[in-house]
Amino acid sequence: MPLSRTLSVSSLPGLEDWEDEFDLENSVLFEVAWEVANKVGGIYTVLQTKAKVTGDEWGDNYFLVGPYTEQGVRTQVELLEPPTPALKRTLDSMNSKGCKVYFGRWLIEGGPLVVLLDVGASAWALERWKGELWDTCNIGVPWYDREANDAVLFGFLTTWFLGEFLAQNEEKPHVVAHFHEWLAGIGLCLCRARRLPVATIFTTHATLLGRYLCAGAVDFYNNLENFNVDKEAGERQIYHRYCMERAAAHCAHVFTTVSQITAIEAQHLLKRKPDIVTPNGLNVKKFSAMHEFQNLHAQSKARIQEFVRGHFYGHLDFNLDKTLYFFIAGRYEFSNKGADVFLEALARLNYLLRVNGSEQTVVAFFIMPARTNNFNVETLKGQAVRKQLWDTANTVKEKFGRKLYESLLVGSLPDMNKMLDKEDFTMMKRAIFATQRQSFPPVCTHNMLDDSSDPILTTIRRIGLFNSSADRVKVIFHPEFLSSTSPLLPVDYEEFVRGCHLGVFPSYYEPWGYTPAECTVMGIPSISTNLSGFGCFMEEHIADPSAYGIYILDRRFRSLDDSCSQLTSFLYSFCQQSRRQRIIQRNRTERLSDLLDWKYLGRYYMSARHMALAKAFPDHFTYEPHEADATQGYRYPRPASVPPSPSLSRHSSPHQSEDEEEPRDGLPEEDGERYDEDEEAAKDRRNIRAPEWPRRASCTSSSGGSKRSNSVDTSSLSTPSEPLSPASSLGEERN
């Protein structure tokens, strides 16, 4: 079923303008997730980046609840004494009854307070709690599924903590508990089963069954309504996990997902329509001048070029100044992440560049962690050879410079035949001989444990991209997370992204997609799909995404072969751009970062919490969603200049990096369109804050503050049949 644009649950103008009148003085927020100070996947990034904006709203009444891990506490958490007597009594009570509960400050931006529950120390109660879970929720958990057993322990400990916290407070606060993913969902179900006075929110960042089904090469999105979910979950031996996730979704006062595409998925697989969509954001750090991030791109690109010089030693027969760096990164899910489509498109791009005699070279990086045992010896040797050449060149340069200096010092021109002696030539010849090798540069930087069956390497063998001299597309598979301490490519992920020209993420299953969002914030164009949350969000809010360096690949309504052809077209068109066009496009891409800032996207979470308070405490809070008029639909406009990446445009100020100057292809200035980057940037930044909508009373807090609305019938809030989005914008259909 196609995405509906008539009812938008992620439209910026649909959000209420909350003011300080909404009283949170006697309210406490607990955000519960398995990835609090415990990096496992993308939820860690969500919590880490969102902590500051949430802390600004809730102050000292904001706490994160997660599992205790020795590594996480040692490197990320400062252990502290609880700041309030009630919280201290809560922890003391639990610790005296056989639990181990720790309190501290997570050392990230915003410095939120965290409560860490030691799951392993409570394993003595596992069987009893599993029995209670069966009696209460009819969910049985097998003994062999350690992850599910940990979820049971974590859920019961979380519920115990929340119940104890409420009991230790003489004046009962209004508690909001926000649970992320199925691993934390048991706690939500138990809160409702034990009738704790807690407003609950459940956010699914990706459905369990959806991820499994997409990995099985099924036509997922066109058959959503046809799946027998119980049968599919049972066949994949995840039925108990699926039950945990579905129960949490149905028990929550407010159910949210991270994107519209995941909302549709959840409606069919979890059988509840989300109340609101809460897109993921980032902490955007703006530069004081436009050229700063362009110069960072040039510096990071130079680091990547050093690696390429070593990796391709002996076959460095291409111009690095005419080389583009593409990359794909993420969890190693070959088809879900679109690595299969990317490889096929690279093979077709290689053919197009060769038959058209292009001087452009593309180096495509695959940054996907896989099972390895050590570095590839040939790759290490390449970096050693590069360093040896650099040392040789510096030695000869110093001797040459000293002789030149001495000659000029006595007032005579140097004799060029005496500037380099025989020893220097011998040293240089030995360095040249060291660069010779018979084999092609390696495709993989590490030795893989399952080389013969690895999906990426198997596909590369099939399509024949072996990094030969004739290939215009080179492939480098780096099956490890990037690190600035690596002996091969000593850069961290952020620096690597800044140095690349294009991020390619043709995912088939991507509920949100932080990787293209990170590219956008850093001013790097990216390719996403209309099956990713990020792609759908950008497609909805930008009139012409490609003009801003956001290319949306159609993987929903096209066949796999057609999608490969479209991706090839995107890549080839990008290769045809001049440096100047890429500079202008990077400027535009970076300006979109305002759309992804938590300062704006954090309001979706704010609205979800207000909705939950109104449902759980109808005598104290009321909530009425705001509906924008049809004329208030928000879309980021096309850039003022035409064409989208103008080759006939004049730069008004030196925003490009110093090493990316180039002539205007012989075109006189009067033939081109005047292009003022500062003026266009000012227009775009104004658009992110406009249009304004009329104020409407939407909330009441009887515990303090002034009245903002008449009370509403909260019975309509208890049914999840229709999304009560603060952003439900009845906008016109858009093509």
Swiss-Prot record:
Start and end residues of each stretch annotated as Disordered: 629-735
Matches recorded under InterPro entries: Glycogen_synth (IPR008631)
Residues annotated with Phosphothreonine modification: 700, 719
Regulation: Allosteric activation by glucose-6-phosphate. Phosphorylation reduces the activity towards UDP-glucose. When in the non-phosphorylated state, glycogen synthase does not require glucose-6-phosphate as an allosteric activator; when phosphorylated it does.
Biased composition range(s): Low complexity: 698-735
Record's catalysed reaction(s): [(1->4)-alpha-D-glucosyl](n) + UDP-alpha-D-glucose = [(1->4)-alpha-D-glucosyl](n+1) + UDP + H(+)
Post-translational modification: Phosphorylation at Ser-8 is required for modification of Ser-11 by casein kinase I.
EC top class named in words: transferase
Biased composition (Basic and acidic residues): 682-695
Residues with Phosphoserine modification: 8, 11, 412, 641, 645, 649, 652-653, 657, 698, 709, 711, 725, 729
Family: Belongs to the glycosyltransferase 3 family.
Protein name, per record: Glycogen [starch] synthase, muscle
Source organism of this protein record: Oryctolagus cuniculus
